[in-house]
Amino acid sequence: MTAILERRETTSLWGRFCNWITSTENRLYIGWFGVLMIPTLLTATSVFIIAFIAAPPVDIDGIREPVSGSLLYGNNIISGAIIPTSAAIGLHFYPIWEAASVDEWLYNGGPYELIVLHFLLGVACYMGREWELSFRLGMRPWIAVAYSAPVAAATAVFLIYPIGQGSFSDGMPLGISGTFNFMIVFQAEHNILMHPFHMLGVAGVFGGSLFSAMHGSLVTSSLIRETTENESANAGYRFGQEEETYNIVAAHGYFGRLIFQYASFNNSRSLHFFLAAWPVVGIWFTALGISTMAFNLNGFNFNQSVVDSQGRVINTWADIINRANLGMEVMHERNAHNFPLDLAAVEAPSING
């Protein structure tokens, strides 16, 4: 009898690590994007929690008037925020080792830059991880494409806008009231409500909510009854079942009669593509609008566009919005400037010394 002995193939430690990282059998898929995503998001989350609780006030405007943002310095959940990096730092990369001390780093708002840059890298890697897992499972890549909309929006307010304005101090604060302040100041300086890309974003978000509610209610109302009257209709569904769980023909007929025939989809695939594409495209446009307004390509200006035969201005809603913009403009950063340029009606006279 002849025995054939084969050398058992041994996998190197690196090979086993690669197999584990890219395995779709793990409870949570890691992937190569996850190798970068996990530490960056953990860093951003940890620093955010610590700074939100205990960070000292930050000199956001660079004029030695620190603004308090943490809970231990008098704020609550609604008023608290991570205050953006000081205008004195501008767009400079400001890690801890660039400051003379940790106290100086905190005073100049170093945590904001640290959190934002790690967060943006982390969410971009999360998007890449979505694509990677889809690829490994043989799925189409549209989940990552849909997620690109919130990634683009976050990148616009945390990175592109500060770059366009010349300072991270113009970025969106990481808190509830800080977000509202950012929105108000953005309207005052860029008239975002009159920008068509923002209008498309509003249509995307509100329209997406409407279509989601319509679709969910139509499906729930046209379930195929698999249970008795004494049981929940939801109990009639088995995970992975081959049969349709609702009657799309009934839903199509209902909606077609409610509005008109061609307002209703008769193709489930095109319907779900529409449900995904509508809000995604809207948010893409909003992110693009923020990115263009970052460089002061602002919303439409229809101020004083209607006059009577005598040349007197007849106010429109555009003029009312403009008046509100001026009020918001003079109220923010009130000690950082003596007189806003927006309110300077004529060019200042030259002074000959």
Swiss-Prot record:
SUPFAM superfamilies: Bacterial photosystem II reaction centre, L and M subunits. The record marks A344, A345 as: Cleavage. The record marks H190 as: Stabilizes free radical intermediate. It is found in: Plastid, Chloroplast thylakoid membrane. The D1/D2 heterodimer binds P680, chlorophylls that are the primary electron donor of PSII, and subsequent electron acceptors. It shares a non-heme iron and each subunit binds pheophytin, quinone, additional chlorophylls, carotenoids and lipids. D1 provides most of the ligands for the Mn4-Ca-O5 cluster of the oxygen-evolving complex (OEC). There is also a Cl(-1) ion associated with D1 and D2, which is required for oxygen evolution. The PSII complex binds additional chlorophylls, carotenoids and specific lipids. Tyr-161 forms a radical intermediate that is referred to as redox-active TyrZ, YZ or Y-Z. C-terminally processed by CTPA; processing is essential to allow assembly of the oxygen-evolving complex and thus photosynthetic growth. The record marks Y161 as: Tyrosine radical intermediate. Chlorophyll a PD1 binds at H198. GO terms for biological process: photosynthetic electron transport in photosystem II; response to herbicide. Keywords: Acetylation, Calcium, Chlorophyll, Chloroplast, Chromophore, Electron transport, Herbicide resistance, Iron, Magnesium, Manganese, Membrane, Metal-binding, Oxidoreductase, Phosphoprotein, Photosynthesis, Photosystem II, Plastid, Thylakoid, Transmembrane, Transmembrane helix, Transport. It is a multi-pass membrane protein. Its main location: plastid. Pfam families: Photo_RC. The chain crosses the membrane at residues 29-46, 118-133, 142-156, 197-218, 274-288. This is Photosystem II protein D1. The gene is psbA.
